[in-house]
C-alpha cells in the first residue's frame, strides 16, 4: 500500500494533518479517495507530534529499483530523487532538512558552472579568475554587500530560514566535494577556463546582484535629460503615469556634474560576466580573431522590455469549473535557462514549479492547495543622493547642517596575475558611495531598499510554497521585498486573487525620478506595508491579468509609494480582450493565449495606410496586408512586412522627435506614447498634422520595404517572418564564440524560427534575433494538479554533456508544452532515472 503524502501542519493552537489514501483500480490506475482527518491538539501540551507517523512508500524496499545509490555526508535519512523524461527532479525526503539539502545537491549537479559564476559574482571574487578587467565588479559587489545580521536575514524568508538555506548550501557543497573527487566529471566550462568550483555559504544565496532591483539607472538618465532638455521636453517624450511626477532638479544641484561616471561601481556590480578569448585555455581556443564579447546568464534588460504575463481565471469562466493560473515571466533568453524546475516533497512540503536555480524553494508553481505566479510591478526602491564634502576632510559630508563621518570598510581583493589590491568602501547614512568628485568636493551615494533585511530576490517564495489559503498567501507576500511583483493566486476552493508586493519607500516631498541632495531634506518616510499595496480577491470579471502595465485602481491612495514608469499596455490589453470575451475556456485556450501573436499596434497602424498611395514593391506589399489578421506568426509574409514597418516607425520617431542633445539619455519613445501621437496627430507633425503624420507613415513603410528587399531579396514570397535573417532564436553560450568549432557545437543551441515581438502576449523581444521573452511558462488547473503544463527552454541542465541540456529547446521554440505531473503514480510513469541518496556512515 502506498500513501501519496503525509501532511504535517502546525497552526496557532492546533495540529492539522490530512491523510490521502490511494485506492487501486483493476486497470492499474489509481484514484484518490480523500478523507480529511482533523485532529486539534493544544500546542502547549504537545509541541511535536511526530517525525514520521507513517513512512510514505516514496522509497522502494528493493534497492535494485534505483539507477544509482550515492552516500552523501550531511544527510539525516535517505532521499529519493526521480528524474522525469523532461528533466524535472522530483525529490522525496523524510524531513525538511534533507529536502533542501537534496535540492541544493541536485541543482548544483545540473547547473554547476552557472553556480560557480554566481558564487563569484555574489562574493566579489571574479577578478581572481578573470583578472583586472573584473576588478570594478568585485569592488561594486563588496560595496553593495548585505552586512546586516545574517540570522535575522535568513529567517526573514522563512521561520526556519537558517535551517533551510544552510541545508541547501550544504547540499551544494556535498555535490562539489563529490565531483572534485572525480574532476574529469566537471562540466566542460571548467576545463575551458581552467578553474574548479568552490564551496558555498548562505551569503551566496542572499546576494542581490542579479535581482530586478530598482530604477537608479533610469533616475540618473532622467536627471541628465532634464539637465540637457528641461522638464517640459522630458515629460513630453516620456510616458509617466498614472500620476504626473515632479522631475525638477533641486536648485542646489550642479547639473554639469551629473555627467560623470557616477554609477560605474553600481553598473559593474550589476552587469553580467563578460568573457574574452584570452580567458580560454589555448587548446580549446578558436583560431579566429574574436573581439566581440558574449555574456553569461542575463543581459541588462531595458527597463521597459523586462516583462511577463500572468493571469488567474475563476471556475465560472472555465469549461471544467476549476480555477486556473497561468504565468510566463519574460527575461533574457539564455543558456542555461534562467528558471529551474523542481518538485519538493517532505512532511509539510509538496510544491512543484520553477524558480531561480541558485536559491531553495519554488517561486512559480503550486502546492496541494493553490497555485501562484508573478510579473514585475513597478516599484522604485532606489534613490541617488548628492553630498557636499568637507574641503578639509573628504570622508565627511554635510547632513542637517553638520559634518558627518562616512563609515569606511577596508577589503582586500585577489586579482589574477596581480598583487592583492586593498580598497576602502565608503558609506553615508543613506548607503554606498559610488563616486567621489575630488575636484568639486561632491560625493554620490545610493539608498537601496533592497539592502534592508529581506532583499534577496524571490527567496521569500519559501513562505508562499506552504500557503494553504488566500489569507496565508497574502501573509507570505508580506515578506516578498524584491522584486516588486504582481503576485497572483488561484486555489482549489474556487478563489482567485492578486496582491502587489515589493518593498516600497514612501516619499512625501519628491518623486524619486531624479537625483536629490543628501543634506536631510529628501528622506523616506518609512516603507508602505506590503498588504497595503494594491490587491483584489475574486474580481467580478472572473479573471485578473497583469503584464507589467499599470493595473492600480484609480481610487488607490498610496501613489507616493509605487512607480510612475510602466510597460506598454498592449500585451495586457490583448490578454484582457481574450479573457473578457471568452466563455467555457479550456486548457488549450490558456496555452494559445500564452503564445498569442496578435499585435494590437499592428491593428492600430495598418488601417492608417488605407488612404496612402504607394508604388512598386511598396504597393505590392501594402496589398498583401489586405485582410491580414494582425498575427505575427512564423512563416507569415504579412508579419514580416508589418514588423519592418513598425521598426522603421520607431527609428524615424527617435530621429525626428528626440533632440540631438538628449539622445544619449532618452534613447527611444515608448510605443504607447508614439501611437497616441500617431492616432491624434498635433503640430509636432507640422502645420498640417494629418498630412505630416501620413507622410511620416509613408516614409516608414517605404523604408521598411527597402529593408526587406536588401535583406531577403526582391521576391515577396521570401519575405517570411521567422527565419534566420528575420526573427529567429539562437542561444549562444557565453563561451561559444571563443572556442573551436567542435566545442562550440556542444555549447550553442539553434537557430530556430520564432514569431511575435515585444508587444504580443507571446513576447519575443530583441529585433531579428530574439533576446528576451518567456523561456519558462506554466499553466495550472487547480482541480487536477496532474493537468499542469510547462515549458523551460532550452533545458533543465546547464551541462552541455547532459541529455537535458537542450532537449526542451525545439518544443519551446515551437510553443509546445509538456505535462508537469504531481501525483506519484503519474511521476513514476514518466521517470527515466531514480537515485537514492543515503547518509554516509
Give, region by region, the residue ranges found by the protein language model.
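Second-shell loop/turn segments in exported
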Residues: 100-102, 149-162, 447, 458-464, ...
Amino acid at each position: 500500500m502506498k500513501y501519496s503524502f503525509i501532511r504535517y501542519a502546525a497552526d496557532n493552537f492546533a495540529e492539522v494533518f490530512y491523510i490521502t489514501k490511494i485506492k487501486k483500480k483493476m486497470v492499474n490506475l489509481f484514484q484518490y479517495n480523500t478523507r480529511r482527518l482533523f485532529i486539534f491538539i493544544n500546542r502547549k501540551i504537545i509541541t511535536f507530534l511526530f517525525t514520521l507517523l507513517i513512512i510514505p512508500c516514496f522509497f522502494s524496499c528493493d534497492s535494485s529499483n534505483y539507477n544509482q545509490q550515492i552516500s552523501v555526508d550531511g544527510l539525516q535519512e535517505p532521499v529519493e530523487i526521480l528524474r522525469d523524461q523532461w528533466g524535472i527532479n522530483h525529490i522525496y525526503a523524510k524531513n525538511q532538512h534533507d529536502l533542501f539539502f537534496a535540492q541544493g545537491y541536485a541543482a548544483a549537479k545540473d547547473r554547476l558552472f552557472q553556480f560557480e559564476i554566481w558564487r563569484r559574482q555574489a562574493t566579489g571574487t571574479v577578478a581572481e579568475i578573470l583578472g583586472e578587467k573584473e576588478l570594478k565588479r568585485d569592488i561594486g559587489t563588496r560595496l553593495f554587500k548585505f552586512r546586516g545580521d545574517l540570522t535575522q536575514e535568513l529567517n526573514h524568508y522563512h521561520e526556519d530560514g537558517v535551517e533551510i538555506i544552510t541545508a541547501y548550501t550544504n547540499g551544494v557543497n556535498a555535490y562539489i566535494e563529490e565531483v572534485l573527487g572525480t574532476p574529469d566529471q566537471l562540466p566542460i566550462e571548467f576545463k575551458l577556463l581552467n578553474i574548479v568550483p568552490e564551496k558555498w555559504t548562505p551569503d551566496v544565496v542572499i546576494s542581490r546582484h542579479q535581482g530586478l532591483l530598482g530604477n537608479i539607472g533610469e533616475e540618473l538618465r532622467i536627471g541628465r535629460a532634464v539637465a540637457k532638455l528641461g522638464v517640459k521636453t522630458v515629460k513630453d517624450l516620456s510616458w509617466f503615469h498614472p500620476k504626473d511626477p515632479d522631475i525638477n532638479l533641486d536648485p542646489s544641484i550642479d547639473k554639469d556634474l551629473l555627467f560623470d561616471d557616477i554609477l560605474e561601481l553600481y553598473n559593474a556590480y550589476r552587469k553580467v560576466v563578460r568573457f574574452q578569448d584570452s580567458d580560454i585555455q589555448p587548446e580549446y581556443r578558436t583560431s579566429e580573431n574574436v573581439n566581440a564579447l558574449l555574456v553569461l546568464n542575463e543581459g541588462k534588460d531595458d527597463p521597459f522590455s523586462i516583462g511577463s504575463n500572468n493571469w488567474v481565471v475563476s471556475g465560472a469562466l472555465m469549461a471544467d469549473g476549476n480555477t486556473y493560473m497561468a504565468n510566463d515571466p519574460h527575461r533574457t533568453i539564455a543558456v542555461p535557462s534562467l528558471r529551474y524546475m523542481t518538485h519538493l516533497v517532505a512532511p509539510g512540503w509538496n510544491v512543484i514549479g520553477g524558480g531561480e536555480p541558485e536559491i531553495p524553494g519554488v517561486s512559480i508553481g503550486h502546492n496541494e492547495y493553490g497555485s501562484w505566479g508573478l510579473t514585475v510591478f513597478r516599484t522604485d526602491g532606489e534613490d541617488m543622493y548628492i553630498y557636499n564634502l568637507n574641503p578639509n576632510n573628504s570622508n565627511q559630508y554635510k547632513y542637517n547642517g553638520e559634518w558627518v563621518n562616512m563609515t569606511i570598510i577596508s577589503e582586500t581583493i585577489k586579482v589574477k596575475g596581480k598583487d592583492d589590491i586593498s580598497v576602502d568602501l565608503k558609506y553615508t547614512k543613506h548607503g554606498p558611495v559610488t563616486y567621489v568628485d575630488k575636484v568639486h568636493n561632491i560625493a554620490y551615494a545610493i539608498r537601496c531598499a533592497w539592502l534592508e533585511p529581506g532583499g534577496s530576490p524571490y527567496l521569500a517564495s519559501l513562505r508562499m510554497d506552504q500557503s494553504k489559503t488566500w489569507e496565508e498567501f497574502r501573509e507570505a507576500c508580506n515578506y516578498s521585498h524584491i522584486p516588486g511583483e504582481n503576485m497572483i493566486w488561484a486555489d482549489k476552493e474556487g478563489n482567485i486573487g492578486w496582491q502587489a508586493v515589493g518593498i516600497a519607500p514612501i516619499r512625501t516631498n519628491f518623486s524619486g525620478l531624479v537625483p536629490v541632495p543628501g543634506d536631510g531634506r529628501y528622506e523616506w518616510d518609512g516603507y508602505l506595508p506590503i498588504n497595503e499595496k494594491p490587491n483584489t480577491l475574486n474580481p467580478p470579471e472572473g479573471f485578473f491579468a497583469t503584464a507589467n502595465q499599470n493595473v492600480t485602481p484609480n481610487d488607490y491612495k498610496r501613489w507616493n509609494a509605487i512607480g510612475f514608469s510602466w510597460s506598454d499596455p498592449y500585451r495586457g490589453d490583448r490578454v484582457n480582450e481574450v479573457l473578457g470575451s471568452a466563455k467555457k475556456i479550456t486548457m488549450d485556450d490558456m496555452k494559445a493565449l500564452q503564445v498569442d501573436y496578435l499585435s494590437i499596434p499592428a491593428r492600430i497602424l495598418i488601417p492608417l495606410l488605407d488612404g496612402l498611395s504607394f508604388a512598386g514593391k511598396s504597393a505590392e506589399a501594402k496589398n498583401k496586408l489586405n485582410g491580414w489578421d494582425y498575427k505575427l506568426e512564423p512563416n507569415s509574409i504579412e508579419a514580416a512586412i508589418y514588423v519592418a514597418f513598425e521598426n522603421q516607425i520607431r527609428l524615424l520617431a527617435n530621429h525626428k522627435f528626440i533632440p540631438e542633445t538628449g539622445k544619449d539619455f532618452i534613447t527611444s519613445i515608448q510605443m504607447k506614447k508614439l501611437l497616441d501621437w500617431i492616432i491624434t496627430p498635433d503640430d509636432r507633425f507640422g502645420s498640417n498634422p494629418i498630412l505630416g503624420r501620413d507622410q511620416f507613415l509613408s516614409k516608414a513603410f517605404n523604408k521598411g520595404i527597402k529593408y526587406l528587399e536588401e535583406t531577403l531579396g526582391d521576391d515577396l514570397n521570401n519575405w517570411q517572418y521567422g527565419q534566420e535573417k528575420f526573427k529567429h532564436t539562437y542561444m549562444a553560450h557565453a563561451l561559444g564564440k571563443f572556442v573551436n568549432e567542435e566545442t562550440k557545437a556542444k555549447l550553442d543551441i539553434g537557430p530556430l524560427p520564432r514569431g511575435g515581438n515585444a508587444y504580443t502576449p507571446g513576447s519575443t523581444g530583441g529585433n531579428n534575433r530574439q533576446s528576451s521573452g518567456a523561456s519558462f511558462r506554466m499553466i495550472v488547473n487547480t482541480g487536477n494538479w496532474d493537468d499542469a503544463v510547462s515549458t523551460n527552454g532550452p533545458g533543465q541542465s546547464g551541462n552541455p554533456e547532459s541529455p537535458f541540456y537542450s532537449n526542451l529547446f525545439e518544443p519551446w521554440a515551437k510553443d509546445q508544452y509538456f505535462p508537469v505531473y504531481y501525483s506519484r503514480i503519474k511521476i513514476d510513469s514518466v521517470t527515466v532515472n531514480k537515485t537514492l541518496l543515503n547518509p554516509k556512515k
